[in-house]
Amino acid sequence: MKTFALHILSPDRTFYDGECESLVLPIVDGKYGIMADHSNTIAAVVPGELSYRTPDGRTHYAAVSAGMVKVEDNDVMVLVETAERPEEIDANRARRDADAAKEAILQKKSIQEYRSAQANLARALSRLRVKRGSK
């Protein structure tokens, strides 16, 4: 299968830098799939589950937060605030974060606080999905 260069970066580290056969990541419109020879594009990444298949046939998963993806000439760059492998996720902390976000949503504060709580909830739930999916 044809491959492309994939770079997944966050402010504090290079999460992955290597060849890839396919990539699926969360964008505003849903899950977005990328394979070799994909058309050039730029899209906003939303909190959720990212997966990519390496040339050895293994599929890897990560919980990502908001960011962007740029596809250009078989070179894909994913820039996100955070990217976590399943083994890096503390499920108890993610549950606490989800509970706190749900409580904040119910408190009916300003629109900005409401949207922030929604984003926190989405991130916590995606972290839990990635953690559960790794077992």
Give the location of each predicted region.
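N-terminal export/targeting signal detector
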Residues: M1-H7, G133
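Compact, glycine-rich, soluble single-domain proteins
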Residues: H7-A100
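Acidic/glycine-rich phosphate/pyrophosphate-binding loops and surrounding catalytic core
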Residues: E84-K135
